[in-house]
Amino acid sequence: MSGQELLTFVVYDIEDDRIRARIANACKDYGLERIQYSAFSGPLSATMRGELIARLGDTLGDEVGKILVLPVCEKDLQARREMLNAPPEPGGSRG
């Protein structure tokens, strides 16, 4: 990430399948990667983030739903904690 970009998370809860797909496509168009079913992340400049926010707002329109766009600074990113309990590999053991 360049000094001008911040890691940006987009998380959404949208009932309409068509609108939800268009939101996902918009995130992909801006180079974000899917991290959960309804969550994307990736580096965005303030300008690109503003454009994406406008596009997401236009896409949601008056439909029922919620979209959170969350830029994260490097300091906060370094303080993150991840917890992962992955399922066992098929045919493997949990030794």
Residue ranges, per PLM feature:
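Basic nucleic-acid-binding interfaces
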Residues: S2-F9, I14-G95
